[in-house]
């Protein structure tokens, strides 16, 4: 093998390892499936924060997705006890994405999913960025379309449930297209 070919071979072998070690970045999608309640048993698409937060090192087969109270999660959470070791669903607005992520992290959450506060948003992903402070967050932070967040919250309210049960992350490449349970209100 020539010296140039050996160099390219090393690069090709190293690149997938580098991507796997660093996880998803902006414009990558992460998928999760709601397992319960059944009326929203769909696979949802989210995007990771651009320059803060951690990555998923574990696949959670069943974990609670707990809507934060208050929904904007800019301070103390009245249901913070339920967020410990679970994933919080919060709404955009009131404070920075990083501030919301830190509030959930301080309550022991494993990750935060921040849905757009524009409930009619069914196609535009917002780029979540650092807030120019020196603060950091270690848990994954994901952005969810406003329509998706609204539909999850609405279903929980209709059923009188304090949380949804989800599986995250979901590898959609291993699911046949006809089996993908996509929300009927969202274009893929």
UniProtKB/Swiss-Prot annotation:
Post-translational modification note: N-glycosylated; required for efficient secretion.
Positions glycosylated per UniProt: 121, 171
Tissue expression per record: Expressed in metabolically active tissues such as liver, muscle, adipose, and heart and different brain regions like cortex and hypothalamus, expression is acutely regulated by the nutritional state.
Segments traversing the membrane: none
Signal peptide: 1-21
InterPro entries, alphabetized: PA_dom_sf, PA_domain, PRADC1-like_PA
Principal place of residence: secreted
Source taxon at top rank: Eukaryota
UniProt GO cellular component terms: extracellular region
Protein name: Protease-associated domain-containing protein 1
Organism for this UniProt entry: Mus musculus
